[in-house]
Amino acid sequence: MASELAMNNSDLPTSPLAMEYVNDFDLMKFEVKKEPVETDRIISQCGRLIAGGSLSSTPMSTPCSSVPPSPSFSAPSPGSGSEQKAHLEDYYWMTGYPQQLNPEALGFSPEDAVEALISNSHQLQGGFDGYARGAQQLAAAAGAGAGASLGGSGEEMGPAAAVVSAVIAAAAAQSGAAPHYHHHHHHAAGHHHHPTAGAPGAAGGASASASGAGGAGGGGPASAGGGGGGGGGGGTAGAGGALHPHHAAGGLHFDDRFSDEQLVTMSVRELNRQLRGVSKEEVIRLKQKRRTLKNRGYAQSCRFKRVQQRHVLESEKNQLLQQVDHLKQEISRLVRERDAYKEKYEKLVSNGFRENGSSSDNPSSPEFFM
């Protein structure tokens, strides 16, 4: 068993242990173990693996150069095949993989995975530069002993990482450009490879270049096609991430597209024609704003009309009051004239009785006419 574990990378496809591991690995029920991985635990496990000495060149002996192992993993003792198999089944080396593989994308059969592994039997050189730099930083933190477990070359990628890249290539080739998966992959790659990048498009481009490099380094047809598909998906995710702020900025700028006066004076048909292609929430918000403005304008118009009508009524009231005063003055003048004429008449009547005496047959006397 120790001789089988000490095989080189060229014997990986024909190894019974590797084939048994691939057959036992249920790709249809892929799960990622969600456990926090501490640096000191990784360093101690790397040191323990180096002290064993028998796993320095096997696919499962590169947790530091490829991916941190499960906390339940330990160096197997030679001669215990069942314990080694149990450790291999419990070895979740996908928890720290930089691209955060989505289990929904692994919708292929085990035969396709075996073909992908066979086509990617050779080591990938220079495909994942950012991944190699991360391995070098981890090896520098672990010390000289952990650096020796990396094989003396930080740019050389471990066989476990080659297996992971083959699985990702086959998944991308069969599942196509899944929007949710590539979007998630884009964010994860941007987080691991470019922690200081602020633009989503830059992170998407980096993930696309990393996927494309992985596919080109494999040399196999499945690897090249899968890598190209992954790269295209990463670029699409980057473009989508770049378009999201554009849509948001367009929505913010769309609010200033119509002024308040235009919203109020514009007809409903014209407004609907202008709002074609706009999101439903934006249309509802603009129509609510238009309704609010129209109600506000209607209230202001009613208030203005009431004030104007009050002014008109007050002016008419003043005119009527002036006319009443004028009529009162006219009445008082007529009353004075009437009193004067009455008094004058009484005087004439009294003077006529004195002049004529008691002669009643005089036609000029007032009694004759009365």
Swiss-Prot record:
Glycyl lysine isopeptide (Lys-Gly) (interchain with G-Cter in SUMO2) cross-link: located at K29, K33, K328
Give the Gene3D superfamilies listed for this entry: 1.20.5.170
- Could you tell me the keywords of this UniProt record? Activator, DNA-binding, Isopeptide bond, Nucleus, Proto-oncogene, Repressor, Transcription, Transcription regulation, Tumor suppressor, Ubl conjugation
What if the gene is knocked out? Knockout mice lacking this gene exhibit small eyes or microphthalmia with an absence of normal lens structures, an abnormal chondrocyte development, with terminal differentiation of hypertrophic chondrocytes initially delayed, followed by a subsequent expansion of the hypertrophic chondrocyte domain in the growth plates of embryonic and postnatal long bones. They also show a lack of IL4 production.
Pfam families in the record, alphabetically?
Answer: bZIP_Maf (PF03131), Maf_N (PF08383)
Reply yes or no: does the keyword Transport apply: no
Q: bZIP domain spans which residues?
A: 285-348
Q: In which tissues is it expressed?
A: Expressed in tubules of the renal cortex and hepatocytes. Expressed in the lens (at protein level). Expressed in pancreatic islets and endothelial cells.
Spell out the PROSITE patterns in the cross-references: BZIP (PS50217)
Name the major location: nucleus
Question: Where does the record place the region Represses ARE-mediated transcription?
Answer: 126-370
Gene Ontology CC? cytoplasm; nucleoplasm; nucleus; RNA polymerase II transcription regulator complex
How does it get modified after it is made? Ubiquitinated, leading to its degradation by the proteasome. Ubiquitination is triggered by glucocorticoids. Phosphorylated by GSK3 and MAPK13 on serine and threonine residues. The phosphorylation status can serve to either stimulate or inhibit transcription.
In the record, biological process GO terms are: cell development; gene expression; in utero embryonic development; inner ear development; lens development in camera-type eye; lens fiber cell differentiation; megakaryocyte differentiation; negative regulation of transcription by RNA polymerase II
Where does the record place Gly residues bias? 212-241
Q: Where is this region: Leucine-zipper?
A: 313-334
| Start-end of Basic residues biased regions | 180-195
> Where is composition skewed (Low complexity) in this entry?
72-82, 196-211
- Answer yes or no on keyword Zinc: no
What is said about its interaction partners and assembly?
Homodimer or heterodimer with other bHLH-Zip transcription factors. Binds DNA as a homodimer or as a heterodimer. Heterotetramer of two MAF and two USF2. Interacts with PAX6; the interaction is direct. Interacts with MYB; interaction takes place weakly in normal T-cells and increases in T-cells following stimulation through the TCR engagement. Interacts with MYB; the ternary complex formed with MYB and the CD13 promoter is regulated in response to differentiating signals. Interacts with USF2; the interaction inhibits its DNA-binding activity on the L7 promoter.
Function, as annotated: Acts as a transcriptional activator or repressor. When overexpressed, represses anti-oxidant response element (ARE)-mediated transcription. Involved either as an oncogene or as a tumor suppressor, depending on the cell context. Binds to the ARE sites of detoxifying enzyme gene promoters. Involved in embryonic lens fiber cell development. Recruits the transcriptional coactivators CREBBP and/or EP300 to crystallin promoters leading to up-regulation of crystallin gene during lens fiber cell differentiation. Activates the expression of IL4 in T helper 2 (Th2) cells.
**Per its UniProt record, what PANTHER family does this chain match?**
TRANSCRIPTION FACTOR MAF
**Entry protein name:** Transcription factor Maf
